Amino acid sequence: MVHFTAEEKAAVTSLWSKMNVEETGGEALGRLLVVYPWTQRFFDSFGNLSSPSAILGNPKVKAHGKKVLTSFGDAIKNMDNLKITFAKLSELHCDKLHVDPENFKLLGNVMVIILATHFGKEFTPEVQAAWQKLVSAVAIALAHKYH
């Protein structure tokens, strides 16, 4: 289990409270699909993913990105209990969707990049360290059910 200090929790929740989940979620998933094109195979039902502009403008990418980031909000509310928080999602992604758990790490790294671009000077090294710790812990929690 990962332990978050009060300062780390404050750094994470401070930025989270300013985030537009719908916009940022679509941007995060879209960037993942553009930068790591092999991840697109998990989204065959999303239609046109043929170019960066098609991906970033795709309403299904935006909707699923919002869903992903909304569940990230659950992580922020339950930072001390991530494995339990993500147990069902881990099982779904492992047993039914067969998502490579490495993709969770990639998405976490994309999240950090997006936070840096959105928050600029507010995204200090200390804030980045707290977010890196969180996205890594979420990736581990999501990979928990994998054998």
Curated annotation (Swiss-Prot):
Globin domain span: 3-147
Cellular compartments per GO CC: haptoglobin-hemoglobin complex; hemoglobin complex
Keywords, ordered alphabetically: Heme, Iron, Metal-binding, Oxygen transport, Phosphoprotein, Transport
Entry's Gene Ontology BP terms: cellular oxidant detoxification; hydrogen peroxide catabolic process
PANTHER family: HEMOGLOBIN FAMILY MEMBER, HEMOGLOBIN SUBUNIT EPSILON
Subunit description: Heterotetramer of two alpha chains and two epsilon chains in early embryonic hemoglobin Gower-2; two zeta chains and two epsilon chains in early embryonic hemoglobin Gower-1.
Family in the record: Belongs to the globin family.
Name of the featured protein: Hemoglobin subunit epsilon
